[in-house]
Amino acid sequence: MYKKILLTVYLCISLLQVGAVGINKNNNIKNDDGFTTIVFDRANSPVPYRIPAITETRKGTLLAACDFRLSHTDVGWNNRNGLWQINIVMKTSKDFGKTWSDTVCVARGNEHAADPVRTAFGDPSIIADRTSDNVLLHCVAGKSAYQTATRQNPQHAYFFHR
């Protein structure tokens, strides 16, 4: 029960962070000045970006993360070629979203990992602590799909801390 309450609070905080800047249906971020910037450009990438997350650090830096789905499918599913890999990529902005850094992979899935949990990382959410410079990135991981997960073969929650 405690885990469900904690997860609900965590998701609500994540959604509030996204709503503070505003993401439209095309994955664009629009700020209060009215300009729109494409953060992760799906039009020029053969690999789909999905599930965006955004937060602002104590110093005003925007952190935007999303899935980079090399498998072209969700965590726990493989494509026709047997590829499972999904990475989480991130960009930063120090000018409230007018310009963005190059894309950096912050969680790299590994098709050949000895531990199947490290095969894919996806569905990111980010929390930035307002009193420190700590950032927490949460995601799901592994080869188990949400729909088929069991206690013996779960879909894992992963946390990265900076």
Question: Where are the regions a protein language model picked out?
Answer:
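Bacterial N-terminal signal peptides that target proteins for export
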Residues: 1-9
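Hydrophobic h-region of N-terminal signal peptides that target proteins for export
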Residues: 10-19
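Asp-box/BNR beta-propeller blade signature and adjacent active/binding-site loops
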Residues: 23-162
